[in-house]
């Protein structure tokens, strides 16, 4: 890193932001590092909000690092602050209390926020969104009270919360506008398994409908005219990027802050990482909203901030724990030739996806972490496999590559 770089400001005190801050110190950056976050808490990882913090044995949340760690590494924390404007010409940001912070390099790691239902649902105490520790605590209180829960959205958040709510013996109805669960991430085989597993666990699943009205009698009206029990409502219908304060810089696109393979925006000296980054992906650009990407993309950005010029090329990988179900997905698990390994009607199987050259382009595993360990390596290396051998679970995976 050049000698003129003495101040780095990171906006967003979550996993990606904290990873950049500590990564810079590990790589020898001796200048000033300031981490700015809207929440008053020390940075923490958000996956625990829909997992550990809602389970029957829930404990206090876990921070990424202790306050002493930040002090030891001379990382300045500006928590409970919101950035209202970033000035690329003046190389400074303005906080909501009027203070200005100067920077030589600016890292945007502001993440995303839950997409909201229509204005008819705004302000209702029964309606929950899951973004912060306070959100999780409020939802947890309703679940512990045994309230009936209507979940709007059949994605990862909705399914994880459904499993947690059933573990607390809450009646659960899940409402999904599409015709299957997790339709953006997995194929029909995995969606069908998730449907069977959650119904077996007591979840009432409704497809092809939307929430239209919150009724005073503790029910929720649907677009087909029916109603479902809804003493509490959890909304998980996607997210929107936190770009407030950066719109005027012309660094955003339809999905977030646009960056190249080096995490650089079109404005010199301004970078983005984590969920907010609209990054090269599958021939286009888009956000990758996973724990692994927030971690690995941030670590790769550190290399570039230190002057190494290393492009980010890791395949998409995420996991979801839904009660006893461990689902993992790598690469493109919804397109290409489908090879099912194991019994898709059981509770342990894998679905591989191959291109026309028999190269592995994606995989989804259900309760099969060993298969995923191999699949991640194959997807990264674009390994070719024998489809017939791959479909035979009696043949070790290592013997399926060609």
Swiss-Prot record:
It holds the Pfam family Reductase_C. GO terms for biological process: catabolic process. Keywords: Aromatic hydrocarbons catabolism, FAD, Flavoprotein, NAD, Oxidoreductase. One of its GO terms (molecular function) is oxidoreductase activity, acting on NAD(P)H. One of its GO terms (cellular component) is cytoplasm. Signal peptide: none annotated. Induction: Induced by p-cumate and repressed by CymR. Its EC number is 1.18.1.3. Pathway: Aromatic compound metabolism; p-cumate degradation; acetaldehyde and pyruvate from p-cumate. It is an enzyme of class 1 (oxidoreductase). FAD binds at residues 16, 51, 83, 131, 275. It catalyses: 2 reduced [2Fe-2S]-[ferredoxin] + NAD(+) + H(+) = 2 oxidized [2Fe-2S]-[ferredoxin] + NADH. Its cofactor is FAD. Component of the p-cumate 2,3-dioxygenase multicomponent enzyme system which catalyzes the incorporation of both atoms of molecular oxygen into p-cumate to form cis-2,3-dihydroxy-2,3-dihydro-p-cumate. Ferredoxin reductase catalyzes the transfer of electrons from NADH to ferredoxin (CmtAd). The p-cumate 2,3-dioxygenase multicomponent enzyme system is composed of an electron transfer component and a dioxygenase component (iron sulfur protein (ISP)). The electron transfer component is composed of a ferredoxin reductase (CmtAa) and a ferredoxin (CmtAd), and the dioxygenase component is formed of a large alpha subunit (CmtAb) and a small beta subunit (CmtAc). Belongs to the FAD-dependent oxidoreductase family. This is p-cumate 2,3-dioxygenase system, ferredoxin--NAD(+) reductase component. The gene is cmtAa.
């Amino acid at each position: 890193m050049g000698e003129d770089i003495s101040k780095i400001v990171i906006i967003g005190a979550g996993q990606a932001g904290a990873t950049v801050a500590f990564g810079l110190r590990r790589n020898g950056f001796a200048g000033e590092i300031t981490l700015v976050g809207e929440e008053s808490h020390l940075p923490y990882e958000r996956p625990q909000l829909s997992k550990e913090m809602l389970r029957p044995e829930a404990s206090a949340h876990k921070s990424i690092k202790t306050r002493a760690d930040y002090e030891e590494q001379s990382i300045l924390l500006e928590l409970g602050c919101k950035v209202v404007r970033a000035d690329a010409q003046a190389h400074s940001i303005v906080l909501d209390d009027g203070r200005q912070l100067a920077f030589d390099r600016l890292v945007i790691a502001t993440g995303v926020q839950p997409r909201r239902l229509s204005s008819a649902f705004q302000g209702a105490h029964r309606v929950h969104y899951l973004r912060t520790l306070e959100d999780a605590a409020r939802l947890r209180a309703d679940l512990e009270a045994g309230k009936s829960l209507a979940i709007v959205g059949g994605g990862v958040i909705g399914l994880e919360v459904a499993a947690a709510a059933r573990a607390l013996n809450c009646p659960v109805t899940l409402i999904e506008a599409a015709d299957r669960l997790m339709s953006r991430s997995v194929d029909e085989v995995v969606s069908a398994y998730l449907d069977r597993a959650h119904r077996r666990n007591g979840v009432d699943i409704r497809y092809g409908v939307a929430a239209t009205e919150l009724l005073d009698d503790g029910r929720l009206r649907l677009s087909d005219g029916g109603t479902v029990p809804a003493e509490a409502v959890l909304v998980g219908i996607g997210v929107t990027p936190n770009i407030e304060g950066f719109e005027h810089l012309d660094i955003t696109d339809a999905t977030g802050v646009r960056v190249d393979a080096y995490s650089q925006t079109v404005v010199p000296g301004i970078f983005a990482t984590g969920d907010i980054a609209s990054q090269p992906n599958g021939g286009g650009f888009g956000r990758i909203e996973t724990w692994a990407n927030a971690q690995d993309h941030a670590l790769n950005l550190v290399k570039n901030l230190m002057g190494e010029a290393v492009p980010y090329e890791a395949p998409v990988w995420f996991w979801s724990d839904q009660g006893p179900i461990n689902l993992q997905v790598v690469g493109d698990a919804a397109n290409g030739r489908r090879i099912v390994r194991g019994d898709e009607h059981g509770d342990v199987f894998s679905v591989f996806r191959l291109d026309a050259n028999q190269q592995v382009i994606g995989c989804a595993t259900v309760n099969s972490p060993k298969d995923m360990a191999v699949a991640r390596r194959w997807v990264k290396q674009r390994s070719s496999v024998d489809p017939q051998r791959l479909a035979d679970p009696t043949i070790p995976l290592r013997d399926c590559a060609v």
